[in-house]
Regions:
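N-terminal mitochondrial targeting presequence
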Residues: 1-32
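N-terminal interaction modules that seed assembly of large macromolecular complexes
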Residues: 20-73
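Mature, matrix/stroma-exposed regions of nuclear-encoded mitochondrial and chloroplast proteins
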Residues: 58-162
Length: 162
């Protein structure tokens, strides 16, 4: 006779946009409540899912997720009102597109490079130029500042893409 282990899903207490999906060998970290959707990455399993702590040293990124993330940003960034407004401050340069692991203390403060998902070119009138999103290869989903957190509008687009 064999034992059957019930697998379950909970919200991650330290980042409420995320869900933890229990598995036999690892815990999937996801923006989706559905454990079958593409996950952000994974951490080793724990006997108590509520005690899982996502740390950079234990977190394994899912490259498929990163591809979807960047495609979603590249497609939707130009119509996201929060970025449209912010672009005015980056006339004639590249605007960093940061996640929200760290909330910036003042206007025009650039996110640290590991928290910058990519860059968009802004013209001299303060308008993002479509098709100019460039991926930041040094971006990490999970680092000493925490795990990825997205603006709500971008999260909605991402959930549709997953």
């Amino acid at each position: 006779m064999f034992q059957r282990r019930l697998l379950h899903t909970i919200k991650y207490a330290k980042q409420p946009q995320l869900y933890l999906h229990e598995s036999i060998t690892f815990t999937k970290v996801s923006f989706s409540k559905d454990p079958n959707k593409i996950h952000i990455g994974e951490v080793p399993s724990s006997s108590d899912l509520s005690k899982v702590n996502i740390e950079p040293s234990k977190f394994m990124e899912n490259s498929k997720f990163k591809d979807i993330l960047h495609k979603t940003i590249a497609k939707n960034i130009y119509d996201d009102q929060s970025y449209v407004i912010e672009a005015i401050n980056y006339r004639g340069s590249f605007m960093p597109i940061g996640d929200e692991k760290v909330i910036q203390e003042y206007m025009n403060q650039r996110p640290e490079l590991p928290n910058t998902m990519g860059f968009v070119h802004v013209d001299n009138d303060g308008i993002m130029e479509k098709g100019t999103y460039e991926v930041n290869d040094t971006y990490t989903l999970c680092n000493v500042d925490g795990i990825i957190k997205l603006p709500e509008t971008m999260l909605e687009h991402l959930l549709k893409a997953l």
